[in-house]
Every structure is written in C-alpha cells, then in structure tokens.
C-alpha cells in the first residue's frame, strides 16, 4: 500500500478536493470515511458531501457521548476500538510518528468507574506535537459499522476501469 496520505495546513476546500480525488482514484474504495467535524473539519465534511460523497462521508465528533457506557467519552471509545482491532490483527503501515503517538496514550478510571483516555494536551506535552496521525487512525473506529453490500451490477459499474472493444474477449 501507499501508507498514509495527509495534508498539513490546507484550507477546507483544498482538503475536500484532495480527499475526493484520492477517493475517486482508489481502485478499492472504503465503504465509509469519518470526518472530524469539530472546528474546521465540519467545512471539509460539508464540501465532500456536496461533491457527491454523502453516502460515504460520515460525521464524527469525538467529544460526543460514548456508545458503550464504560467509556468516559467517544474519543476513549475510538481508541479502545482501535486497540481491540490491533489485538485482532489490524495492520497499518509502519510509521514512527504514529507509533510514538499511540504509545504516549494512557488511561485512568474516573470516580464512577469509567475508562478515560488521557487528554490531547497531555499527549502534546509528552511528545511535543499534536497526535494527528493516531487521531486519524482512531477516527476510523468512531463507529464499528458493517461492510456495505454491493449488488453484482453495482460492483462491476464501480470498478470498471476501461471500455473493452467488442470481441476483445
């Protein structure tokens, strides 16, 4: 694979355009793409939907309440889902920054017994930068959704790469 693709400090329109280009260029397309809709990410999400990917783009807000009540918030739940997937064999291309960010995360228990991930500010203090890569990977586990089911005709239409002349086969 290509590893991680990222863009630093781009405006929302450029980021949305770059995402849409990468999605359309991909031979195997993801069923879903979660967008961090806190702050400027909301504009990227809106534009990606306007560009026709509203069936793929899903809004994600890590400050929301967790689906599972054992977690303090959705951010904690996302990172737990990621850790669980890694234990089950989930693989990402090796990336030194991602490894550093993931290893910097710690957790504690709240007085009412909920699992709480350390704050983003604590991570920034520990590693000297924002944990952008680990947040992006964890965001893919915002919700555990089933794979999309495709009809055979939809699959062929989606993945057809060129027009084959009549009689070529």
Annotate the PLM regions.
Residues 1-116, 158-169:
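Mg2+-dependent endonuclease catalytic cores in nucleic-acid-processing enzymes, primarily RNase H-like
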Residues 96-157:
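Charge-patterned, long linear interaction tracts outside catalytic cores
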